[in-house]
């Protein structure tokens, strides 16, 4: 996905970019509950959760293949009342919202995002009755998404008090989930991403990057998403060698995803390897038809900036 998860640069991130990181990270982590009812649970060796084939297809399209268009098609047929499906729809709506220039379409995407965020929370409230762990996790996601909407529409200064309230609620639900099973792979994947996101991007004493990395290394699954989270974290912690090792592991597990090429390109550029970075930016753009326009624009901007840097050095 975009920004923090899929790669927009961290140091000078705009408030809207930070919000997209939160949306992307939350959705990714939660979308990992995407095992269809008759398929193997990607996190557990026993007691798989019944979620649905269409939701599973959407999850794999986004996070294994980086194919958002196929994901949108699957989500149009997704199982009713499934919180994960609503969270994924929210993520796609946010991507359209941020990438749209037509104001009427932009407003429609904003409204869709708000609606799906609310549906994520409300369906999680129902799930809480039968599956407390996942119910609490999705309640956390719903609150995160609703907080992201507030900041995006009201701005950082006006929206922060309400968004902080949503953030506190989200952590309360995550804590409840952790009481049920502190080593649950879904929980640790989600908390690993969120804690790392907040630790490196937001000046709040809510998260520890060390603990987040430990969660991703020890307990999170599936591994290719854990490696991706580690690559993002090490990138933003200015540890490019470790970031490169992690992204290589992610690519080995999910080689068709153009967003992984994009992230590796960023890491290589930070190491000063502009030539290989440019090649990977271009590789990611060769699959631009399956990516949201906002992500494509980000890649194009970073490619152009890197090309200018190379040209200036050669003068």
Question: Which sequence ranges carry the predicted segments?
Answer:
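N-terminal leader/linker segments that initiate helical-solenoid repeat arrays
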Residues: 2, 24, 28-118, 312-315
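Terminal, low-structured helical/coil segments at or just beyond the last alpha-helical repeat
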Residues: 2-4, 40-47, 236-237, 270-315
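Short coil/linker segments at helix-helix boundaries
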Residues: 62, 89-133, 138-179, 183, ...
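Short coil turns that delineate tetratricopeptide repeat
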Residues: 76, 80-83, 129-132, 182, ...
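TPR/TPR-like (Sel1-like) alpha-helical repeat modules
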Residues: 79, 168-172, 208-210, 214, ...
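Alpha-solenoid helical repeat scaffolds
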Residues: 87-91, 137-139, 186-190, 224-232, ...
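Alpha-helical adaptor scaffolds
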Residues: 189-249
